C-alpha cells in the first residue's frame, strides 16, 4: 500500500487513484528563460523517480510537465539577448531537454507549452468573469480572492493573514484591484511587448492561470497528483486551486506533493540570491548519474545540502554498485532471500517514496551479491530497483587485448606460474583493470 504525504492535509494518506491502475499526474515545469540550476533539477528528478516507482508497481501514469514559455522573465531575457521571446523559449527548452536527459529523466507523456493553449486560457478567464470570480480593470483581469472558499488552505494561511500582509501597498497595480490580495489572470501588454488579442485588449496570461488550463485541458477537472517545489505552495499552487475549483466546482487534485530545496551552505539555492550552479555547468565536471544518485540520498521532501563531499560520496557509492552489477552472475538463485530484498525495497518506497531508505536496501542487496555468486534473476532485480532512480548501467565490453591478458593470467595460475600471473595482473592495473580472485572465479572492476 503506497502512502503519500499530502501537503493539503499535512499527513500521510493511503494512495487511492481516481481510476484503478491509472494515475493522472501534473508537475509544474520550468520557466524557460535560462539554464535550470541544480535546485530546479531536484524537482524534475524527484517526480521522475515517483513516476517510475508507480510504473514499477504496475500503474499506467499520464505524466504531464509544462514549459512556461510566456513570462516577464522571458521578455526581459529576449531584450538582453536581442532575440524574440519565442527564440529564448526554444533555446532553453532545448537546453532543459539536454540537461535532464543527462540526469536520466524520462520524457513526460506530454510537455505542453503555454502558447499552445492561448484560446483555452482566454475562455477560462471569460468563464471566471461570468461566474463572478474575476473582474476586468483597465485591460487587466484579476481573480476575486475573497470569493474563493477557504483560500490559501494549501499554504495553511488565512485571507486575513494575506490582507494584513498586503496592507499599505500603494503601487500602480494595487490601485487597479478591488482587493490588494487579488491576483492577475490576464495582463495588459505594454507597447512593443509580445501579446495576444483578447476581449480585454492585447495582453498575455498570468502565471497561475497557465497551469490550471493546461492541466484541466489535458487531464480533466480533477487529477490524482499535482506536484512541484516547496516554493510553489504559495502563491502558485494556492492560486491554481482557487481559480480551477471556482470554474469547475470540483477538487483540482486529490494529492499535493512538494519537494524540498537544494541548499548551499544551508541556504536555499536560487537565482535571486546568486548562489546557484546550473546543471549545464555541473555536468562539465560531474557525470549526470552521479548528480542523480546524490539526490536519491535524501528523502524528496527534506532539504539537501549540495557539497563537494556529498557529491563525491555519491560518486564512490555509485561506482560500488556498478562494480556489483558487472559481476558474472553465473551461479544459482536464493529465491527466498531475493524476495526478501524485493519486499524490503517495496516497503521502503511505499512509505512516501523514501528513496534514501530504498537505496539502503539496494546496498544491503549489493553486499549480499558480493558475498556469493548468483544467477541472472538477481542481476535483473538489482537493475529494476536502480532504474527507479534513473540509474542504468551499460556493461563495458573489454577489448580483445585485455580479454586475452585475463585468459593468459588464468592459464598461468592454472600452471602455477604465479610470477607471470602477477606480471599480467600488474599490467592490467596500469590499464585501469583491477582483478579479484574468488572461489567462484576471477572478477574484474574498472578503476
UniProtKB/Swiss-Prot annotation:
Record's catalysed reaction(s): tRNA(Cys) + L-cysteine + ATP = L-cysteinyl-tRNA(Cys) + AMP + diphosphate
Ranges spanned by the short sequence motif 'HIGH' region, renumbered to the chain: 30-40
InterPro entries registered for this protein in UniProt: Cys-tRNA-ligase (IPR015803), Cys-tRNA-synt_Ia_DALR (IPR015273), Cys-tRNA/MSH_ligase (IPR024909), CysS_C (IPR056411), Rossmann-like_a/b/a_fold (IPR014729), tRNA-synt_1_cat_dom (IPR032678), tRNAsynth_Ia_anticodon-bd (IPR009080), UVR_dom (IPR001943)
Record-listed ATP binding positions: 271
The keyword Cytoplasm appears for this protein: yes
Covalent S-S links between cysteines: none
Pfam families referenced in this protein's UniProt entry, alphabetically: CysS_C (PF23493), DALR_2 (PF09190), tRNA-synt_1e (PF01406)
Predominant cellular place of this UniProt entry's protein: cytoplasm
Motif ('KMSKS' region): 268-272
Manner of cofactor binding, per the entry note: Binds 1 zinc ion per subunit.
Protein name (database record): Cysteine--tRNA ligase
Biological source species: Streptococcus pneumoniae (strain ATCC BAA-255 / R6)
